[in-house]
Amino acid sequence: MGKILKSKSSWPRTVVRKWLNLRSGAYEFHSDYPVKGMEPRRKSCSDMIVPENFQGWLGQGNGDLKHSTGEQHVTRVDDKLDLKMFVGTWNVGGKSPHEGLDLKDWLKSPADADIYVLGFQEIVPLNAGNVLGAEDNGPAAKWLSLIREALNNTNNLSPNELEHTKSSQQPRFSFSGLSDDTPIPCNSTPPRGYSLAASKQMVGIFLCVWVRDDLRKRITNLKVSCVGRGIMGYLGNKGSVSISMSLHETSLCFVCTHLTSGEKEGDELRRNLDVTEIFKRTRFSRSSKDSRPETIMDHDKVIWLGDLNYRLRASSDLHEQLRNHDWESLLEKDQLKIEQRAGRIFKGWEEGKIYFAPTYKYRINSDNYVVQTEKSKEKRRTPAWCDRILWKGDGMKQLWYVRGESKFSDHRPVQSLFSVHIDLKNQSNRKTKPVNQNHRPNPVLTYTCHGKVQAEEILLLTRAQSCIDTLPRLISSAS
């Protein structure tokens, strides 16, 4: 009886420790790029999986990249550079990828991209163990491996590049086989292709940025920021992972989000509040004299991607329009577009024209949507465009906005291709852009939604108690 009481009283401390652990590791990220001036960091759950001397894990440093000696300075011949940027988002429904999963359908593009920005939601199941316990980065490692293989497929290389790749390849390492003192070799001259600039995970949200190798030395100021908007408004089952970086003299920010779910009336207000809080709480560390971007809106160009979870406003003709594939009429009921037109969120942001079918909710391994019937016990799910890509900033043009057809999860992936103008010369007269005023929270909205969210999340925690009781590692860590 004493053990049961102890277990039931331990979950608040477990939640607090989880929150503190997220905060202590908030500025760590994974990268192929070595960084100098790395600041010492407090140990977190990642240290139990990857040894401290693993050169891929980066603490938040001064953002300056270490280049190997002998690299020649590239002459700048123009003020601007035109690049292609591929952006993809995919809610994978808590499923870990199987070996050999083909990502070609998702990563295909009408033109080769210089930068790939890939965001995931639910890379792990959003159960009590993953939300409150140590982070499971096994699925993230698998996704990175598959992406690396797809982007650097030797079938797409020229004979010279192929020979260089063969001579430069290093043996693969398994995280599960690492001990605390296992040395991991770092190849100082990677083959031509794509390298991981940065990746960051927060529970089920995972964001990674890949850059063409010949642009690698022009990437600086890599930083990350996480905002939890899940349980109690701070845990990471919902929220955002953001990556900030500079390419030449242009600052870029990528925000991968998984917003509050639900299609009851008023749930869109909770999603609006998530967006407001993400703008408010996303911060990239910098010194007091540093002019580098600190907030999302300080950047020159911003991409916002993810499962935004906005649904279709209920109406009598909704299902008829779905049957007729009348996407134009259905999009008039899209909550994201309604809220944006009203100026409540994403004022001044752009999204491409949607010509594809709703991306959620599908039956697994099927082309059929989940539709509730009288005998069905499933939650009511009206198909919707939950998965979106938006952008803000001058010098960006969307060339392509489509969905993939992978049946891996209950969401269809979405992808886009952008043409991006990059400044090659320092714009010394450029001033920091203020955060848009429309993202300040409405006091009444904040108070109403906060009370509703708190009540529902306390109920969720209570129901999750039976799950927590079965997790010895959580109980022992909290005792």
UniProtKB/Swiss-Prot annotation:
Keyword Hydrolase found: yes
Region of interest: Catalytic 2: 379-394
GO MF terms, alphabetically ordered: inositol-polyphosphate 5-phosphatase activity
Family statement: Belongs to the inositol polyphosphate 5-phosphatase family.
Pfam families in the record: Exo_endo_phos2
Gene Ontology annotations of biological process type: phosphatidylinositol dephosphorylation
Chain residue ranges for the region called Catalytic 1: 300-315
InterPro entries: Endo/exonu/phosph_ase_sf (IPR036691), IP5P_plant (IPR045849), IPPc (IPR000300)
Ranges annotated as spanning the membrane: none
Gene that specifies this protein: IP5P8
The keyword Acyltransferase is annotated on this UniProt entry: no
Full protein name: Type I inositol polyphosphate 5-phosphatase 8
Keywords of this entry: Hydrolase
E.C. designation(s): 3.1.3.-
